Amino acid sequence: AEFRNEVAKKIGTPGTYANCVTNHVGSQVTAFRRGAVEVGLVLGEVNDGVSMTGLATTTKGRKSLLSLYNVTGPVGHRAVSIPEHHGDVVRTIVERLDISREISHHPHRPTVAVSSFSSSASAVSKVGEIRVETIGEDLIARLVEDLETQVLAGVLLSMVDLPASDPACAWAAAELERLAFSFSAYLPEFSPDGDVLRLQRFTDLSLDVDHIACGRAEGEALRDFIVEEWRRVTRKAVLSSE
């Protein structure tokens, strides 16, 4: 990872990403020494059958991963669109990274009819990923169909990556919250078109979120926000379906 960081600096790559386990803080501390900043948390991404030799863990069931970003080169200014209730946490992330972002919360509807996205799912890991390139009027209807297929495949964790530079991103995130998607991460320069707002839906309510270890107070604050958002959105979705 350190070698990758040095290579990224030499070639002017904006930054590098790392996903660290949360059953202990060792890998997180190593990343902190390289200048990495916590940008998100993916709940229950690691199968509960995965264990680390010689490392005890109090986590029960599937394990979560902490997402970190390390700025290694020039990061240009961008205008992004996110829901208002994500505003404080995203502002904190970009301030800690010392990058320039103009943040809008206005829920602009899409200006195009047809969405563009790619989707993948694994029956082994029980994780599904959807990466949206273009937000169109048909996005939610098409995602509902895709997510139904994921559920039939036994997927527990579904992630949707939205292009934050799309003015309709805040609208799409609000619509996806109705489908039980909550904030997972804010990922600067993650796609060729810029920043990504990652949302997640974990359908197994037995997920252990009480033993997620973070290496410093900033990570703990981000973890607490993400866990509380997951609880709030999931509870809201369950109540609305009754």
What are these regions (language model features)?
Residues 8-22, 153-163:
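Conserved GNAT acetyl-CoA-binding A-motif
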Residues 176-242:
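Non-catalytic C-terminal interaction regions
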Residues 1-10, 15-18, 26, 33, ...:
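Conserved acetyl-CoA-binding loop-helix of GNAT-fold acetyltransferases
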